Amino acid sequence: MNKQTATRNLDEIITKVEGARLRISEHHIVKIIGISKYSNQEDIATLYNAGQRAFGENKVQDLKDKMTELEELPIEWHFVGTLQKNKINNLIDLNPTLVHSLDSLELALELNKKLEAKNKKLSALLQVNSAYEETKSGVLPEVAIEIYKQILESCPNIRLKGIMSIGAHSEDEKLIKESFK
């Protein structure tokens, strides 16, 4: 990907996101996280040079590899994938800006225990399965507030920053919107 194409594509995405944001509220702040799952280091560097600063990976090993390959760039790295318990220590050592996929109280307790042992803190979002889809991880909406409170009370090494939810996988806009009510 060349810089001109990257810049044009990024500008188009920013324009669409900004338009959607303004239709909802001019007071909301939106950050675009470029998911680099299928991108090589050259493409990520090109997008960085075009203005994209935050990138997300869905596998701990891929996050580590890309962070190492691109360490000269001050990229804001996010973890967006399902976190397996056997990968927690590796993720903690990478210290991503934000973990988007804290999908259960059990995972939060295990993550907190390992953070405490390393004397570290980590920012995270509670993942809510608002579409009630079996293929998606996350807590169900009706227990989300209670689990959020439990994590706040019992996991001092996790800095909860909010929730993350993915709408229904559908072409039906009404069904997608229902996922976020």
Language-model features: where?
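Conserved alpha/beta-domain cores
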Residues: 1-181
